[in-house]
Amino acid sequence: AAYLVRDANFDGHNIHILESMDVLGGSNDGAGSVQQGFVCRGGRMLNEETYENFWELFRSIPSLEQPQRSVTEEILNFDHAHPTCAHARLIDKDAKILDVRSMGFDNADRLAMTKLLLTPEERLDNMTIEDWFGPHFFETNFWYMWQTTFAFQKWSSLFEFRRYMNRMIFEFPRIETLEGVTRTPYNQYESVILPLKAYLETNGVRFETGRTVTDIDFAPGEALTATALHFSDGCAVDLRE
């Protein structure tokens, strides 16, 4: 929606965003209150060096607290002033901080990792991480840090693991402190989703929450032209050209 409004000069009044939940944001949603607490189900592991599209888009979105600045400026200024620096990436069962300055790889792990990064993604379909790496890999400091940072399991998709490796390769030298992770001033719902929502609303975009689409009617013919939306509450909306 933001690209349509900003780059294509699309009339925002003709954009309707439907959300089945009662709160916007998808996996970056956030809800709650000071009294009852907040629930934020997920967030993006932002990185200044590699999230070019994200930073470019949010240079166009004004900050809610500092409208003269963009969201990109607000986030990067905050992160530079308050960089991430974890001192206890891994602890043992006795709450002792472990030394993670070494990745813990052996030569077989290094060879498998190099081979993975050089292998085309189409060859990795239907493979798990455990299919590629030997048992020793899953006992390394690297695996424990990477797993807990990105929620990987041994049975997770191998090509998804490879994508994360390529995207976050800059984190290798600093994964023991997470210094490369870009922090937002507040949770990402408040620092990212709400400013974007405000920008879209200012340009006429309409949001409807609690709306689940269960079926779509299409016009006859080879072209895919939707003519109506059906919702879980039994209502239907006809679509116009």
Residue ranges and their predicted role:
Residues 53-60, 128, 132, 145, ...:
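Amphipathic alpha-helical segments that form well-ordered structural scaffolds
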Residues 2-6, 198:
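Short, well-ordered alpha-helices that flank and scaffold nucleotide-derived cofactor binding pockets
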Residues 40-46, 116-120, 178-187:
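Active-site rim elements
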Residues 36-75:
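Conserved FAD-binding subdomain of flavin-dependent enzymes
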Residues 1, 19-20, 51, 203:
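Conserved beta-strand->loop/alpha-helix structural units within folded catalytic cores of enzymes
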Residues 63-167:
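Rossmann-like flavin
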Residues 167-241:
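Helical element adjacent to the flavin cofactor pocket in flavoenzyme catalytic cores
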Residues 5-32:
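Glycine-rich FAD pyrophosphate-binding loop
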